From Swiss-Prot:
This is 3-deoxy-manno-octulosonate cytidylyltransferase. GO terms for molecular function: 3-deoxy-manno-octulosonate cytidylyltransferase activity. The gene is kdsB. GO terms for cellular component: cytosol. The lineage of its organism: Bacteria, Pseudomonadati, Campylobacterota, Epsilonproteobacteria, Campylobacterales. It comes from Helicobacter pylori (strain ATCC 700392 / 26695) (Campylobacter pylori). It is found in: Cytoplasm.
Length: 243
């Protein structure tokens, strides 16, 4: 099951999930991409998103406005839907309308093999890495996440480090091995690091839970601001989004 948490009043870009992306609302684009891989449900917090999804025949459930993270919203949706404890759950974002089918499939495969949870990352350049909106991740020898940050990690002290360690940009999608894992993660107390960085995935690392990271090729960009949206609409074309 794929769940897309969608909040109307995003702090940096209100109503962004309803913004038009070449004739379709952003959240609808995201859901249509997800439906190419598995059954998808939008977990929304407002009737306007619910009605938009219904208009385009996208399955949706109405959840609380008071969740601290998309993961918490996914859990409520999973409970509403009555998912079994052993069902695998993917958490995609409502602001990734350009996410490729191949990336979702890669996440699904990584989740099958991950004991706790999985996510994806892609190689980025130094200029991209400067943006705090693009989260960076560093990995251990088994491609599990060591840390996620809005800052530049690792810091490239020497020129040779550029060749030895590629910079990795996190793609904010998650796979939970089963619903019980999702329950376990949400039951953990929020940690200081996630509050400082505003990155919910740091909770798992703080409590020594493994996050497997699949490195993929992707041109997708997350839409965090109005500027992100305008830039993306210049880069992508309607033909590119046709599946």
């Amino acid at each position: 099951m794929i769940i897309i948490p969608a909040r109307l009043k995003s702090s940096r870009f209100e109503n962004k999930v309803l913004e038009d992306i070449f004739g379709l609302p952003m959240v609808v684009r995201c859901a249509k991409n997800a439906n190419l891989v598995d059954e998808c449900v939008v977990a929304c917090d407002d009737e306007s998103i619910m009605q938009t999804c219904q208009k385009f025949h996208i399955k949706a459930v109405l959840t609380s406005k008071h969740h601290n993270s998309g993961t918490e919203r996914c859990l409520e949706a999973a409970r509403i839907l009555g998912l079994k404890n052993d069902e695998r759950v993917l958490n995609l974002q409502g602001d990734e309308p350009f996410l490729e089918k191949e990336v979702i499939l890669a996440l699904l495969e990584a989740t099958k093999n991950a004991p706790f949870m999985a996510t994806c990352a892609k190689v980025i350049d130094e200029e991209q890495a400067k943006s705090p909106n693009l989260v960076k991740v560093v990995l251990d020898s088994q491609n599990n996440a060591l840390y996620f940050s809005r800052s530049l990690i690792p810091f490239l002290r020497d020129f040779d480090a550029k060749r030895q360690t590629p910079l990795l940009g996190h793609i904010g999608i998650y796979g939970f091995h089963n619903k019980e894992i999702l329950e376990e993660l949400c039951a953990l107390k929020p940690c200081v690091l996630e509050e400082i960085e505003k990155l919910e995935q740091l909770r798992a690392l703080y409590y020594q839970k493994k996050i497997a990271v699949k490195i993929v090729q992707s041109e997708s960009v997350g839409i965090d601001t109005q500027e992100d949206l305008q830039n993306a609409l210049k880069i992508f074309s309607p033909d590119l989004l046709e599946r």
